[in-house]
UniProtKB/Swiss-Prot annotation:
Described function: Catalyzes the ATP-dependent biosynthesis of glutamine from glutamate and ammonia.
Source species taxonomy: Bacteria, Pseudomonadati, Pseudomonadota, Gammaproteobacteria, Enterobacterales
Gene name in the database record: glnA
Keywords per UniProt: ATP-binding, Cytoplasm, Ligase, Magnesium, Metal-binding, Nucleotide-binding, Phosphoprotein
EC number(s) on file: 6.3.1.2
Protein name in UniProt: Glutamine synthetase
Organism expressing this protein natively: Proteus hauseri
Regulation of protein activity: The activity of this enzyme could be controlled by adenylation under conditions of abundant glutamine.
One BP term from GO: nitrogen utilization
Length: 469
């Protein structure tokens, strides 16, 4: 998409504002809105200056100036703003060099794609993430010196079977772990998801399906088609934006927290991926599960670096409340065809062109640019160093006896473990200057503040366990 096309969109749709969007280190989209009349030739060459010191984990106040460089190919109409507004995604550049800022997630993703091409291994990596989310009616939480609490409510929640409502309790709701695929009225989110799909398609995503997920209280998923890595990361941000805003329009509140409910399934973001060169799928072959030797080496790299990857794919303290056995959480670092208890699955496909792997431990609070790039770099390290993943595990890993289970490596058990693993195992990420030691150090420092904050806060459960001891 060219400047001319952007200008024609502005004229055709009587656009009044341009919303410049970028993603911070934690994966949250930020934005800056400017009048549409500021868009001209210079705008796409010079960008828009902004204060980078206001973004956590980025610049200090003494060197705060940074450049938002709009990517004209990402222009699309915003479906929610009152005034006609055009969204344009931006890379964050250093003003002195006009090169991608080494801590900018989107620039890191683009450098990873460039590194893939320069390696000669492949020219394209495809990603297909599957973010899950909850829709609640009401969420309240409190954290201050006087105490801490949270409360979740939703008309669909299993705990509301005996709740009195003004117009009566209709009784149709999914029980704990009983939400997968029921028809309405048990599935109360059908129309909300359909609206999400309509808007996602208007914004360029290709929707493949939508459905209720396993958990009670409104766990849902919209499945969208794969794309190249940075484009799919852009689409993941669009996906989250649409989910949260459509929920708001319907009087609901959406969360991508991995584990908001105790005792029911959490939300994951399984990541499907494959490599290709000159249009040929390099993961298709005659090895286990129809994979190529290259694909097996890629899996070997993911398994070898999994705990370091967890720092990007599972970047919150809440992430590790999902990654526990017994809740369809893939904690064991093994691979298998079809077996959903393994952390890496080889899906059944209709043709060899669709051959791919599915990494199942990521969750939807991952920054998609960083999580996708880190997984690619781990896989490429596996290919370069011919890291074989060993034998596949086709048995149900959730039911293994303890003596067998302890022989299988697992993902990190906490955010602190994951951050320490990344600190010790980072070299594979720095190949080709994709990640820098500076960007990794800044990431570690930012997320360690989360670990420390949670560590220092008394938990309500501790009062139940210890108050009268």
């Amino acid at each position: 998409m060219s400047l001319e096309h952007v200008l024609s969109m502005i004229e055709e749709h009587k656009v009044r504002y341009i919303d410049l969007r970028f993603t911070d280190t934690r994966g949250k989209e930020q934005h800056l809105t400017i009048p549409a009349h500021q868009v001209n030739d210079d705008f796409f060459e010079e960008g828009k200056m902004f204060d980078g010191s206001s973004i956590g984990g980025w610049k200090g106040i003494n060197e705060s100036d940074m450049v938002l460089m709009p990517d004209a190919s990402t222009a699309m109409l915003d479906p929610f703003f009152q005034d006609p507004t055009l969204i344009i995604r931006c890379d964050v550049l250093e003003p002195g060099t006009m090169q991608g800022y080494d801590r900018d997630p989107r620039s890191i993703s683009k450098r990873a794609e460039d590194y893939l091409k320069s390696s000669g291994i492949a020219d394209t990596v495809l990603f297909g993430p599957e973010p899950e989310f909850f829709l609640f009616d009401d969420i309240r939480f409190k954290n201050d010196i006087s105490g801490a609490s949270y409360a979740i409510n939703d008309i669909e929640a299993a705990w509301n079977t005996n709740t009195k409502y003004e117009d009566g309790n209709k009784g149709h709701r999914p029980m704990v772990k009983g939400g997968y695929f029921p028809l309405p009225p048990v599935d109360s989110s059908q129309d909300i998801r359909s609206t999400m799909c309509n808007i996602m398609e208007e914004m360029g995503l290709v929707v493949e399906a939508h459905h209720h997920e396993v958990a009670t209280a409104g766990q849902n998923e919209v499945a969208t088609r794969f794309n190249t890595m940075t484009k799919k990361a852009d689409e993941t941000q669009i996906y989250k934006y649409v989910v949260q805003n459509v929920a708001h329009v319907f009087g609901k509140t959406a969360t991508f927290m991995p584990k908001p409910l105790v005792g029911d399934n959490g939300s994951g973001m399984h990541c499907h991926m494959s490599l290709s060169k000159n249009g040929t799928n390099l993961f298709a072959g005659d090895k286990y599960g129809g994979l190529s030797e290259m694909a097996l080496y890629y899996i070997g790299g993911i398994i070898k670096h999994a705990r370091a990857l967890n720092a990007f794919t599972n970047p919150t303290t809440n992430s590790y409340k999902r990654l526990v056995p017994g809740f369809e959480a893939p904690v064991m670092l093994a691979y298998s065809a079809r077996n959903r208890s393994a952390s890496i699955r080889i899906p059944v496909v209709a043709s060899m062109k669709a051959r791919r792997i599915e990494v199942r431990f990521p969750d939807p609070l991952a920054n998609p640019y960083l999580a996708f790039a880190a997984q690619l770099m781990a896989g490429l390290d596996g290919i370069t160093n011919k890291i074989h993943p060993g034998d596949a595990m086709d048995k149900n890993l959730y039911d293994l006896p303890p003596e067998e289970a302890k022989e299988i490596p697992t993902v990190a058990g906490s955010l602190e473990e994951a951050l320490n693993a990344l600190d010790a195992d980072r070299e594979f990420l720095t190949h080709g200057g994709v990640f820098t030691n500076d960007s990794i150090d800044a990431y570690l420092a930012l997320l360690r503040t989360d670990v420390q904050r949670v560590r220092m806060a008394p938990h309500p459960l501790e009062f139940e366990m210890y108050y009268s001891a």
